[in-house]
Swiss-Prot record:
GO terms for biological process: methylation. It catalyses: L-lysyl-[protein] + 3 S-adenosyl-L-methionine = N(6),N(6),N(6)-trimethyl-L-lysyl-[protein] + 3 S-adenosyl-L-homocysteine + 3 H(+). Disulfide bonds: none annotated. Keywords: Cytoplasm, Methyltransferase, S-adenosyl-L-methionine, Transferase. It is found in: Cytoplasm. InterPro entries: Ribosomal_L11_MeTrfase_PrmA (IPR050078), Ribosomal_PrmA_MeTrfase (IPR004498), SAM-dependent_MTases_sf (IPR029063). Its EC number is 2.1.1.-. The keyword Transferase applies. This is Ribosomal protein L11 methyltransferase. It comes from Pectobacterium carotovorum subsp. carotovorum (strain PC1). Methylates ribosomal protein L11. It holds the Pfam family PrmA. S-adenosyl-L-methionine binds at residues 145, 166, 188, 230.
Length: 295
C-alpha cells in the first residue's frame, strides 16, 4: 500500500527524542540519515553516534491526517509552531523485489564470484560463493571487502590455513576455503556474526573446515599461513601486537577497513614484523598487505 513520508531536519543530540514523538503521533517507522551524507566511521567504544545535522524520516499510513500529525508535533518543545518539514506521498512498490534487484553476482580477481542465491551463476566453472546480502555483515559490496577478496584470489591458498579476524558474515574465510584453503578460523566479538558465518559456511558446503570463536574462546596458540583482518583502523592499531603474532614466519597478512588517510599509521604498527607491500586503494579505502619476516 502507499505511504506518507514526513521528513524533519534536526540535530543529532535530539534526533531520538524527535523519533519517539513521531512514533507517538502515529508513525509506523522512523529512520535517521545524515543530511549531508557524511559517514561516521569509528564511534568511540560504547558510543552510538548520530550526525550533527540529521534528517528524521517517518512513515505514516496513507489514510493518516497529516494536519493532525503536524499539530501534535508542534506541541513538542524541540519543534514548536511552524517547524520546517517535508511531506511526500510514496508510491506502492514491491519493496522486497526492488531490494533484491539491486544485487547481482560480483567478480573479484580472476577466479572468484560472490553470488546472491536468487541469481544465476554466471560461470559454473569459477569459484562461486553463495551469499545473500544482510543488514550487518559483509557481502562484497563494500570497497574494503572487495579489496580483501581480490587479494585472497591472488594468493596460492591450496592446503593453507587462514584466520579471518573479525569475520562478520564469514565471507573472507569461506572464499578462502573455496579457493583451496584446507582450514579456516573465524574470530568475531559479535555472537550474531558467529552464527551468520556458520549459516553461510553450511550453505557453501565448507562448514566442516571452518572453526568459529568468540575472542574469549579462541585457542591461545593460534597461527596460520594467511591472516586477514577487515575491521577498522583503530582496532587494527590497538590489536597490532596480537594480530602480528598470528601469521607464521613467511605467512601473509592482509588488513583493511582502513581509510587511505589512515594507512601510514596502521602500516607503522606492523612494520617491525612484516615486509609490507605497496598500499592498494579503492575509492577512499585501502588494503595493507605484507609477509612476516623470520624472527
Amino acid at each position: 500500500m502507499p505511504w506518507i513520508q514526513l521528513k524533519i531536519n534536526t540535530s543529532g543530540n535530539v534526533a531520538e527524542q524527535l523519533g519517539d514523538a513521531m512514533i507517538e503521533s502515529g508513525a509506523v517507522s522512523v529512520t535517521f540519515q545524515d543530511t549531508h551524507d557524511t559517514p561516521v566511521f569509528e564511534p568511540l567504544p560504547g558510543e552510538t553516534r548520530l550526525w550533527g545535522d540529521t534528517d528524521a524520516i517517518a512513515l505514516y499510513d496513507a489514510e493518516t491526517d497529516m494536519n493532525d500529525v503536524i499539530a501534535m508535533l508542534e506541541q513538542e518543545p524541540l519543534l514548536g509552531v511552524g517547524f520546517k518539514h517535508k511531506i511526500e506521498q510514496l508510491e506502492d512498490k514491491d519493496w522486497e523485489r526492488e531490494w533484491m534487484d539491486n544485487f547481482h553476482p560480483m567478480q573479484f580477481g580472476k577466479r572468484l564470484w560472490i553470488c546472491p542465491s536468487w541469481r544465476d551463476i554466471p560461470d559454473p566453472t569459477a569459484v562461486n560463493v553463495m551469499l545473500d546480502p544482510g543488514l550487518a555483515f559483509g557481502t562484497g559490496t563494500h570497497p574494503t571487502t572487495a579489496l580483501c577478496l581480490q587479494w585472497l584470489d591472488g594468493l596460492d591458498l591450496e592446503g593453507k590455513t587462514i584466520i579471518d579476524f573479525g569475520c562478520g558474515s564469514g565471507i573472507l574465510a569461506i572464499a578462502a576455503l573455496k579457493l583451496g584453503a584446507a582450514r579456516a578460523i573465524g574470530i568475531d566479538i559479535d555472537p550474531q556474526a558467529i552464527q551468520a558465518s556458520r549459516d553461510n559456511a553450511q550453505r557453501n558446503g565448507v562448514s566442516e573446515r571452518l572453526e568459529l570463536y568468540l575472542p574469549k574462546d579462541q585457542p591461545a596458540d593460534l597461527s596460520a599461513d594467511v591472516v586477514v583482518a577487515n575491521i577498522l583502523a583503530g582496532p587494527l592499531r590497538e590489536l597490532a601486537p596480537l594480530i602480528s603474532d598470528l601469521p607464521k614466519a613467511g605467512g601473509h597478512l592482509g588488513l583493511s577497513g582502513v581509510l587511505a588517510t589512515q594507512a601510514d599509521g596502521v602500516a607503522e604498527a606492523y612494520a617491525d614484523k612484516f615486509t609490507l607491500d605497496p598500499v592498494a586503494e579503492r575509492e577512499e579505502w585501502c588494503r595493507i598487505t605484507g609477509q612476516r619476516r623470520a624472527s
